[in-house]
Amino acid sequence: MHDDRLRRHEAATAPEDLGRMFVERANAGDVAGLVALYEADAVLALPTGQATGTQQIRQAYEHLLADKPTFTPGEQQPALVNGDLALTSTRLTDGAVTVEVARRQPDGTWLWAVDQPNILG
């Protein structure tokens, strides 16, 4: 699950950190940094289906960031934590809501295992 990708990026010490890190890295055009927020076999929902695993998630973010969009932080909700799993959610400024499942890694950091970036909006 966890690998050396996080050594060159800040690691999430709380599940809520992942949303902030996403906005920072997306606005910086840091595709590798975005991919580092996910477990190696994570699932990312897309308008056309889903991306599974590091390579497909990387391709999805390369496509998304090609036009250099700007991301605005939303209202991060407190994580709902049960053991090594956490449900995270953010209400975006356009009214859309994101929902993610994060998993605590063996070193205590958190990575997304499932990401549904837009369920309303």
Give the role of each language-model region.
Residues 82-85, 107:
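Residue-level signal for tight coil/turn positions that link beta-strands
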Residues 13, 31-82:
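A solvent-exposed, acidic/Ser-Thr-rich amphipathic alpha-helical stretch
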Residues 72-74, 94-99:
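Short, surface-exposed coil-to-beta transition loops
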Residues 86-93:
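Short beta-strand segments that buttress and anchor functional surface loops
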Residues 46, 92, 105:
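Acidic surface patches and DE-rich sequence motifs
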Residues 97-121:
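Short beta-strand edge/turn micro-motifs at domain boundaries
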Residues 1-40:
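Short, low-complexity N-terminal intrinsically disordered segments enriched in polar/charged residues
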